[in-house]
Each structure stands twice: as C-alpha cells, then as structure tokens.
C-alpha cells in the first residue's frame, strides 16, 4: 500500500539526522516538495517495520551517501502545510537525531539537489526554517556537551 504524502489521511512519521563533523553540520537542499529548493536537515519518511534509528541511517545513506552512527535523540516536532483553501496538504511528525559520520563522503543523492557543511555561525546564510535552525543549534550544543 502506498502512503500519500499530499493530502494524507493521517499525519506521517518522518526522521532526520543532524550530522556534525569537524565543527560543521551537514545541510541538504531539498529536491522535491514540500520545501523544494530550500536548505534543511537530511531525512525522510519512516518505513513500515523500521525503528527510528534504522530510518535515520537509511535516509542519510539515500540522501547523502553517508553511513552514520545515531548518537542521541534531539527533539520531535510537527510540520503542517495547508493549501490555498486551508486543507492540510502535508502533515508530518518528525523525530530528529544527532549523528556522527561512520564512513563515506557527503554528496547529493535521492531527493537532494545539493549538500553543504556549515558552522553554527554560518547557518543564517542558508535561510533555514526557524525549526531547522533551532534543531541544528541544539545539536551543536549537544555535540559540545559530549566533548
């Protein structure tokens, strides 16, 4: 059974991974709606039978070519995108995790048009959503606390 992303019958569960390496976070430019063309955190939809962490690892490999280790849960939030008539076009519940690179080189792959590594003080130049900015800054703080 295929789940409809547009005009879903119920909220869809997504996962994301904030990958930090060498004091920089990995950003992706979305290649498909919603937020097509905008910079964001890599991630996507959880598949049936997958744990959150398995989903994060799969999505990061698909979108960026990186094999990652999931370090710690960051936060959960929801994104609701209404259409022009006020109907819910997209509704996601997203769990984001702090991740570390195990292997690979970051590259744009599935559903991604570009990748970039950004220091915390450089985030503003990528015009991230307020939620993505908050999550990434929280990930940097967690990374520093881990030493």
Protein language model features and the residues they cover:
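A conserved beta-turn-beta hairpin within the catalytic core of GNAT-like acetyltransferases
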Residues: 34-37
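Acidic, metal-coordinating catalytic segment for phosphate/diphosphate chemistry
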Residues: 1-16, 87
């Amino acid at each position: 059974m295929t789940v409809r992303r547009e005009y879903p019958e119920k909220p869809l569960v997504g996962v994301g991974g904030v990958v930090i390496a060498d004091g920089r976070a990995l950003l992706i430019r979305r290649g498909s709606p919603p937020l097509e063309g905008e910079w964001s955190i890599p991630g996507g939809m959880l598949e049936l039978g997958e744990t959150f962490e398995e989903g994060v690892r799969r999505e990061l490999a698909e979108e960026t070519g990186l094999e990652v280790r999931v370090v710690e849960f960051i936060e959960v939030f929801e994104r609701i995108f209404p259409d022009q008539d006020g109907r819910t076009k997209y509704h996601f519940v997203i769990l984001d995790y702090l991740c570390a690179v195990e292997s690979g080189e970051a590259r744009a792959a599935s559903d991604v048009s570009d990748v970039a590594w950004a220091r915390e003080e450089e985030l503003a130049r990528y015009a991230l959503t307020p939620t993505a900015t908050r999550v990434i800054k929280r990930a940097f703080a967690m990374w520093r606390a881990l030493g």
